[in-house]
């Protein structure tokens, strides 16, 4: 089995796969203060839950947008396995044709999602990632990665609103019943859900206008955000939260020349 990690600023997705399928995914929170040993204990618990013996791990791959944690997780692999993991970045074959000014600026998470999406979906396409940031990756009809739209993520902007306003309360992450809120809580929930859905629809409209054609639109990222926000969008958007792990699987076997 191959152990894969997708490290975001907010959460870390842990997955296991082989040549046939993705066997499991789990999520833990990102904490810059945790030591390699603390993360190793957490990952060992995840493996135990999924009945995976660390001795079964024969390879590894990491995609990270938190460079400061890369060495930490290399040490985690050393603590749990005999594996030296791949790190998604320059020098690793991804299969993604990146056509932007400086490909080195492109986050690893965007690359792995694009690697999977180009194998599964028709181009042109927009890949929406709902995470710490909300991103729109664009691939043209020739499946060239031509650019990204980035803005603050749903939870990031919402937390900033509640922390920096004196009279707005902390509220639960619950769906609103209607757009026009009749209380502070309902109004804020409306903004979080309907506001972000409208923003997503608006960005899709502008991207398609700029390309001059309709796109396949896929959403990935945090499962609860995809499940709560995307249904309020008016565009047809496929939800595929396994996309990053599928991309890590694709890239791993592309670089080991064992993929079927």
What are these regions (language model features)?
Residues 2-6, 61, 125-129, 218:
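Short glycine-aspartate micro-motif
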Residues 26, 176-216, 236-238:
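Adenine-nucleotide phosphate-binding core of ATP-dependent small-molecule kinases
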Residues 52-105, 142-147, 153-154, 183-193, ...:
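Short beta-strand-loop/turn "lid" adjacent to the catalytic site in phosphate-handling enzymes
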Residues 83-86, 92, 96-164, 194-203, ...:
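Phosphate-binding/catalytic loop of phosphoryl-transfer enzymes
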């Amino acid at each position: 089995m191959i152990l894969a990690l997708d490290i975001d600023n907010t959460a870390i997705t842990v997955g296991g796969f082989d040549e046939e399928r993705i066997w499991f995914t789990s999520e833990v929170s990102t904490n810059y203060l945790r030591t390699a040993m603390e993360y190793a204990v957490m990952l060992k618990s995840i493996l135990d839950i999924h009945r995976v013996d660390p001795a079964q791990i024969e390879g590894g791959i990491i995609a990270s947008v938190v460079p400061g944690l890369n060495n930490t997780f290399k040490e985690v692999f050393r603590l749990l396995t005999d594996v030296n993991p791949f790190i998604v970045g320059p020098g690793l074959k991804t299969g993604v044709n990146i056509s932007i000014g400086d490909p080195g600026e492109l986050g690893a998470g965007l690359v792995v999602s694009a690697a999977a999406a180009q194998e599964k979906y028709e181009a042109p396409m927009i890949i929406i990632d709902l995470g710490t940031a909300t991103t729109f990756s664009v691939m043209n009809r020739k499946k060239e990665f031509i650019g990204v739209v980035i803005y603050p993520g749903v939870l990031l902007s919402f937390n900033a609103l509640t922390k920096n306003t004196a009279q707005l309360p902390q509220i639960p992450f619950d769906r609103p019943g209607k757009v026009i809120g009749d209380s502070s809580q309902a109004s804020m929930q409306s903004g979080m859900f309907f506001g972000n859905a409208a923003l997503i629809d608006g960005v899709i409209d502008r991207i398609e206008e700029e390309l001059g054609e309709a796109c396949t639109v896929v959403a990935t990222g945090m499962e609860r955000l995809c499940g709560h926000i995307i249904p309020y969008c008016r565009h047809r958007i496929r939800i595929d939260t396994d996309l990053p792990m599928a991309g890590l699987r694709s890239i791993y076997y592309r670089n080991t020349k064992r993929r079927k």
